[in-house]
């Protein structure tokens, strides 16, 4: 399969290149960038020297359609809503890593992203690509989920789908490494601001909130809202999500683990930790795994779920490739089965 990557110089694009080089059924046909053309990626990223020689090109939709079967769009939000359309119309596989096609309500997108929304007919065509819970496995236009949304939804899905929790009780405390803010530097991601520091940001206003709610209410329409906070922590990669919920009825630790293990029995990238063991960010670094730990406090009747992912892999490029595997009828783990980087 021939693929093109638009937005190849960003962190998400770089991860796509790294991972696709390990995929036996995929060849990179073209690489595209808004900020640089004619040079190779190794000019900007020396770690790719002698590994990726394709030149960076301007975006030429006719050329991409001619040379590719699949297009990955790894641009900031607000760009894919325009540039994705010709590839969808041409019948190519299109996987958008931005937020432009995730929300089915155009007004919600414009409220939370502060940008004009994509045409409604294209939003309707896009399949939300939470890989473990895809509705239409044959879909060829995928809105890849956000990193916070992925960690949160995988962490809470078994309880919500089973309708075992008080729908008003969901509290999510999510923390991200600095790469989640993207490649373009800012005052808030400056080394001296982030090193030995932790910063709460976008309190009650993160754009992944409506995305999470859209999927949660699909599973349980009685959920009215969630309490959701996000923080930056001084690591390069990783999402560490702690979720608190109250079950409708008391539950044992064994019942909790049985529920999660049965839900994810056939999910190659979700690993449920043993009882009383909780995952760390380090154990999923540079991998497509989501590791989940569980606890129940019978005194407070609170379930705690710890869900960790690498924001650039399971939270972006890795899940995008997992979605490609599903749509192309490859093995779901093709190009993604490797040991996390440790230490």
UniProtKB/Swiss-Prot annotation:
Chief site of localization: cytoplasm
Pfam families cross-referenced by the UniProt entry: Semialdhyde_dh, Semialdhyde_dhC_1
Pathway: Amino-acid biosynthesis; L-arginine biosynthesis; N(2)-acetyl-L-ornithine from L-glutamate: step 3/4
Active-site residues, Swiss-Prot/TrEMBL: 147
Gene Ontology biological-process entries: L-arginine biosynthetic process
Keyword S-adenosyl-L-methionine tagged: no
Enzyme Commission number(s) from the entry: 1.2.1.38
Entry superkingdom: Bacteria
Record keywords: Amino-acid biosynthesis, Arginine biosynthesis, Cytoplasm, NADP, Oxidoreductase
Compartment(s) of residence: Cytoplasm
Enzyme class: oxidoreductase
InterPro entries: AGPR_AS, AGPR_type-1, NAD(P)-bd_dom_sf, NAGSA_dehydrogenase, Semialdehyde_DH_NAD-bd
GO molecular function, one term: N-acetyl-gamma-glutamyl-phosphate reductase activity
Regions annotated as coiled coil: none
Catalytic activity: N-acetyl-L-glutamate 5-semialdehyde + phosphate + NADP(+) = N-acetyl-L-glutamyl 5-phosphate + NADPH + H(+)
GO-annotated cellular components: cytoplasm
Function field: Catalyzes the NADPH-dependent reduction of N-acetyl-5-glutamyl phosphate to yield N-acetyl-L-glutamate 5-semialdehyde.
PANTHER family (UniProt xref): N-ACETYL-GAMMA-GLUTAMYL-PHOSPHATE REDUCTASE, CHLOROPLASTIC-RELATED, N-ACETYL-GAMMA-GLUTAMYL-PHOSPHATE REDUCTASE, CHLOROPLASTIC-RELATED-RELATED
Family designation: Belongs to the NAGSA dehydrogenase family. Type 1 subfamily.
NCBIfam families registered for this protein in UniProt: argC
Protein name: N-acetyl-gamma-glutamyl-phosphate reductase
Organism: Listeria monocytogenes serotype 4b (strain F2365)
């Amino acid at each position: 399969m021939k693929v093109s990557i638009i937005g190849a110089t960003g962190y998400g694009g770089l991860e796509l290149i790294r991972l696709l080089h390990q995929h036996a059924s995929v060849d990179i046909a073209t690489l595209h960038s808004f900020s640089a053309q004619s040079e190779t990626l190794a000019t900007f990223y020396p770690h790719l020297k002698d590994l990726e020689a394709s030149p960076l090109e301007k975006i030429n939709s006719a050329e991409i359609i001619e040379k590719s079967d699949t297009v990955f769009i790894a641009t900031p939000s607000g760009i894919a809503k325009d540039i994705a359309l010709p590839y969808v119309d041409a019948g190519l596989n299109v996987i958008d890593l931005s937020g432009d096609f995730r929300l089915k309500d155009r007004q919600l997108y414009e409220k939370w992203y502060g940008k004009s929304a994509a045409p409604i007919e294209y939003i309707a065509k896009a399949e939300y690509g939470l890989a473990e819970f895809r509705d239409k496995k044959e879909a060829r236009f995928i809105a890849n989920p956000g990193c916070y949304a992925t960690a949160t939804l995988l962490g809470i899905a078994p309880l919500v789908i089973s309708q075992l929790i008080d729908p008003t009780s969901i509290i999510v405390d999510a923390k991200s490494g600095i790469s989640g803010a993207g490649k373009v530097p800012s005052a808030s991601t400056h080394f001296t601001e982030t090193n030995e520091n932790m910063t709460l940001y976008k309190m009650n206003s993160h754009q992944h909130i409506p995305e999470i709610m859209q999927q949660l209410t699909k599973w349980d329409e009685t959920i009215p809202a969630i309490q959701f906070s996000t923080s930056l922590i001084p690591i390069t990669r990783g999402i560490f999500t702690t979720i608190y919920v109250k079950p409708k009825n008391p539950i044992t630790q064994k019942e909790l683990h049985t529920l999660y293990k049965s839900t994810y029995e056939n999910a190659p990238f979700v690993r449920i930790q043993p009882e009383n063991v909780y995952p760390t960010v380090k154990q999923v670094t540079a991998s497509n795994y989501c590791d989940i730990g569980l606890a129940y406090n019978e005194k407070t009747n609170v379930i705690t779920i710890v869900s960790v992912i690498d924001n650039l892999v399971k939270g972006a490029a890795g899940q995008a490739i997992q979605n490609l595997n599903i749509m192309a009828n490859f093995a779901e783990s093709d190009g993604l089965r490797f040991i996390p980087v440790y230490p």
